């Protein structure tokens, strides 16, 4: 965004870019947004405008709406915020890619260098019975700081389009306190079945004799983990995480949809 849009216009007289600012809430006149209250360098101040654009991502956008009194009454009331406008869909429909790693011990000379590209896609396929093409993504991973990686090969499995959806809720009226993220990963049976297949497919692929000269042994999951659906489910639950694409918490849709938050022009309903 900075390279594509800001760099060429950052010197315009009618544009101010200010970093290190924490927005506390959106200000309203009735149900019309008129400005924001923010903090920077220990100073709290108000910025007003004819149009207030909230573009803070899938975590901070619903958080700011709720801190401003726009959201589900139950969650707002639980942290002492007086509702300005009840909108039950704010923070709902929280989604991300369920993601986990298989771990292998490499033979001498075949460790994955920590400065390798973060993601290197090696395999995409559709799980059995899936209506989504190529809904499983597999790639070798590096993630730690240079020189801090364990001497192992990690292979990431990612479910690209999950059915499961969770919610984001406030735990405090303090804008500096992170909200609670409950992704409900693999709650839907189809998601769990697809993830089981992804893991078993990776075990089979990386157990092929073509990798005998590279991989010494599989560290995780173990043979006991793979012995049954129940044992594999337990391993999934211990290891499941999410990838970097949180979305859905300010859903676009018609006002008649109680789970939607904005219309086709990204205007908040109500």
Where are these regions (language model features)?
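Conserved redox-cofactor binding core of oxidoreductases
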Residues: 1-41, 101-105, 113, 221-222, ...
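Non-transmembrane alpha-helical segments in soluble domains
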Residues: 6-7, 62-65, 73, 196-203
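Loop/turn elements at helix/coil->beta-strand transitions in domains of secreted/extracellular proteins
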Residues: 13-16, 49-50, 270
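General small-molecule cofactor/ligand-binding pocket signal
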Residues: 16-18, 82-86, 139
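Glycine-rich loop(s) and the adjacent beta-strand/alpha-helix scaffold that form part
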Residues: 25-26, 35-114, 173
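FAD-dependent oxidoreductase catalytic-site/capping-region signature
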Residues: 107-111, 118, 122-270
